[in-house]
C-alpha cells in the first residue's frame, strides 16, 4: 500500500518546541503472566488505538524486557506517560498502572472488568471501524464525576487524591485551543466517568458522527408513496391514530440505530454557507450593470420621489443555521477501574495513598525512615558507581596514552633507521660513480663535443 502524502507547502509545520510539548505515551505489558495472556494482549492493542497518534502502536515487548528498559528509553523518545498492564500470578487480577515520567507519580488501578473492541462490535448493528484519517488527531477527553473542590463530607486527603487523578488524566492528551482547533478534526471521544457512590471509574471510546437532520423514517415512506405509485403505503390497520405512526409511540426502545434522538440535535452554522454567501455578495458588488439613458433618467426620478428601504446588513450577513445531529458510536474497549494506590516515582517510590490499607502515624514514620535509608543507600551506590566509572575511564585513558606514546616512539625509530640507510646508500652510489668514471681520461678531445658547422 502506498504511503499517504502529507501536504507541506501550504500547511504549517510543527516546530521542535511544539513537538516537545506534545505528551507521548507507551502502552506496555509487564510480567511473564501478562505476556502469555492473549486477551490482555488484544486489550493493549485496543488501548493503543485510543492513545493514537502520539503513541507507539507497533511496539513489541519481549520476555527479557524489564520495566527499567522502557523507562530508560522514555527520555530520548520524549515519552511522558507509561500505561502498564500487569497480571498477578497468584490471583490472576489485571492491573493498570499510569506513570508520569521521569519523576512520577504512579497511579495503580485494579481492572474489575473489560471488554475488547471486537466484543463491542458484535453487539452493534452498524459497527464502526477506524480509518487512518480518523486517528490523525487525539480524541476529545471528557471527564465526568470528578470534583477537585472540597465538599462537606470529604476530607483534604480525598480532595488531593482526586486532584492527582484528574491532573494525570488531563495531561495524557495535548490541550485544545478552541480558537485554533477545527471541529472537523475532532472525530473521537475518550470518556472517563466516575461513580461517586462506588468510586469505580469507567472508560469508553466513541466515534463522533455528524449527520443532517431529516424527517423521520415513517414520514419519508409516506412521501415516497405519494410521489411514486409503485411504493406501498405503510400498513395502518394496527395503528389507532396517525400520530402513532409519525411519533413512533409503538416502537418504544426498539428503534433503529440510525434514528437520531431529539437531545442530540443542535443548530450549527456551516462555514461553507458563510463562504458561499460572502462570495455571492462580493460578486454582486463587483459586477457592474449597464443601463441605458432612459433607465438612468427613470431611476433618478424614482429616487427623488420615493425613498427605498435598504435591507440591513446584519440580516444578509448572518447565514441560517442548520439542524445537525451528533451520534456517538462506541468503538471499544471498555474498562472498569478501581483505585488501589498512588506512589511516588515510577513503581518504586513511597506510597502516598492506599485505598484499602490504612497506616497509623507510627507506622508512617517508620516507613518514612525506611524510605529515607533506602534513598541514602541508593545515592551512596550511585556515587560509588560514578567513582568506579571514573576510575575505569582514567585507567583506559592512561592505557590509550601509553599506547600512543609507544606508537610514536616506534615511528621515530623507524624514521631514524630509514635516514641511516639513505645516507649509506648515498655514500655507496658516489663511490661507485667514481670507480666507474676513473678510466675516462681527463684530456678528452673537445672536438667530439664541438658544434657541427
UniProtKB/Swiss-Prot annotation:
Compositional bias of kind Acidic residues: 440-453
Keyword Transcription regulation: no
GO terms assigned for molecular function: rRNA binding
Compositionally biased residues, Basic and acidic residues: 373-398
Domain of life: Eukaryota
Positions with biased composition (Basic residues): 1-11, 399-409
Domain Brix as annotated: residue spans: 26-348
Region: Disordered, residue numbers: 1-22, 275-327, 373-453
SMART domains cross-referenced by the UniProt entry: Brix (SM00879)
Subcellular location: Nucleus, Nucleolus
GO terms under biological process: maturation of LSU-rRNA from tricistronic rRNA transcript (SSU-rRNA, 5.8S rRNA, LSU-rRNA); ribosomal large subunit assembly
Oligomeric form and interacting partners: Part of a complex that includes BRX1, RPF1, RPF2 and SSF1 or SSF2.
Note in the entry: Present with 1350 molecules/cell in log phase SD medium.
Function: Required for biogenesis of the 60S ribosomal subunit.
Protein name, per record: Ribosome biogenesis protein SSF2
Native organism taxonomy: Eukaryota, Fungi, Dikarya, Ascomycota, Saccharomycotina
Gene: SSF2
